[in-house]
């Protein structure tokens, strides 16, 4: 992505923060969900259920959160399962794109799919059920975000809960402190907030 606007703001000593987009070369604090922690929790949960053919369906890895998810997934799959070339599909964060890419994951033998967003999870479930398969009877699915109503689906979606209120309030507080500071100096810092795995009805034992 183009970093010029960030450097221009820093040169003008205009305080700013970033959210879920950390870049070491950007002189500003970033407030992010611990994507790696969330992916690790998701893989560990599926591994405990007996899954070894686990796939990741995420966004394009030029986007920072998607890259962090893919890197963490590759690492934890190697550590827990010994799979050093795991199944990863990159696509857009849309229902339609996820639905289309789910076919490739199933063709490669995935019995569980971790997605980069709840919307992607819904797209994956749509494809799975359209093929006459069940969630979680045949395929387990995990989302990421824990957006509104995910607990009211059938099955309710197992997902990674992002602590959005904490992230936003901390980012706003930091920004106002910088605006009040008479000696403001643009400085990079990372503030990582731990997500939580919310286990619901879309994950089950491998068969």
Identify the function of each model-found stretch.
Residues 1-44, 48, 105-108:
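Alpha-helical recognition/docking segments in bacterial nutrient-uptake
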Residues 52-54, 83-86, 133-141:
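Short acidic capping loops at alpha-helix termini that bridge into adjacent secondary structure
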């Amino acid at each position: 992505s183009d970093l010029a606007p960030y450097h221009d703001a820093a040169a003008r000593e205009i305080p700013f923060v970033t959210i879920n987009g950390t870049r070491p070369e950007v002189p500003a604090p970033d407030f992010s969900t611990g994507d790696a922690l969330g992916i690790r929790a998701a893989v560990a949960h599926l591994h405990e259920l007996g899954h070894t053919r686990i796939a990741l369906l995420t966004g394009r890895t030029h986007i920072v959160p998607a890259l962090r998810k893919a890197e963490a997934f590759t690492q934890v799959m190697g550590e827990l399962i010994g799979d050093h070339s795991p199944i990863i599909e990159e696509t857009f964060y849309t229902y339609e794109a996820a639905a289309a890419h789910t076919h490739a994951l199933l063709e490669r033998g995935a019995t569980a799919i971790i997605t980069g967003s709840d919307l992607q999870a819904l797209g994956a479930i749509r494809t799975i059920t359209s093929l006459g398969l069940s969630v979680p009877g045949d395929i387990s699915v995990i989302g990421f975000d824990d957006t509104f109503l995910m607990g009211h689906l059938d099955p309710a979606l197992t997902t990674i809960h992002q602590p959005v209120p904490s992230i936003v309030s901390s980012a706003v507080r930091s920004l106002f402190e910088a605006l009040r500071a008479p000696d403001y100096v643009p400085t990079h810092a990372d503030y990582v907030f731990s997500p939580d795995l919310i286990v619901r009805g879309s994950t089950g034992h491998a068969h």
